[in-house]
């Protein structure tokens, strides 16, 4: 979401990497969010391209992010720091220069071809069963779809 703001509304320039050893692309904002939002990252990842392609995609992801932050609160009995820092900035403001004329578009499926399906939820479930089983854990029991 921060990357969407930076790429839609920012001015691209060159800056130094964190170590100072290399030059990196940066996007500076002049709308008061420069010091609040995270730096742009993974700008060509299909999910990043998807979220900044249309306002409806951005709004959908904001709603998902808020839901995930709420789930974090239920599980760990505290508010995630990212929500404290970015909640109002991200979900109270869509990027100014984002396309507004198209409805929610098809979700990108960033996974091996053998897991891709017509439906993104089915595809990601297949991906997690096949490739992410070793690290998947749950606090409220294993979901039925995972077996």
Name the predicted role of every residue range.
Residues 1-44, 48-147:
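Sequence termini and other peripheral, non-core segments
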């Amino acid at each position: 979401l921060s990357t969407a703001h930076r790429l839609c509304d920012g001015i691209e320039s060159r800056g130094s990497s964190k170590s100072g050893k290399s030059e990196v692309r940066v996007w500076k904002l002049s709308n008061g969010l420069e010091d609040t939002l995270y730096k742009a990252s993974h700008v060509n990842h299909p999910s990043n391209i998807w979220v900044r392609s249309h306002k409806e995609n951005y709004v959908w992801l904001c709603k998902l992010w808020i839901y995930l932050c709420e789930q974090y609160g239920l599980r760990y009995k505290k508010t995630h720091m990212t929500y404290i820092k970015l909640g109002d900035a991200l979900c109270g403001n869509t990027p100014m220069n984002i396309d507004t004329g198209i409805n929610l578009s098809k979700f990108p499926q960033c996974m091996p071809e053998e897991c891709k399906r017509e439906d993104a939820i089915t595809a990601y479930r297949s991906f997690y069963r096949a490739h992410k089983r070793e690290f998947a854990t749950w606090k409220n029991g294993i979901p039925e779809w995972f077996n």
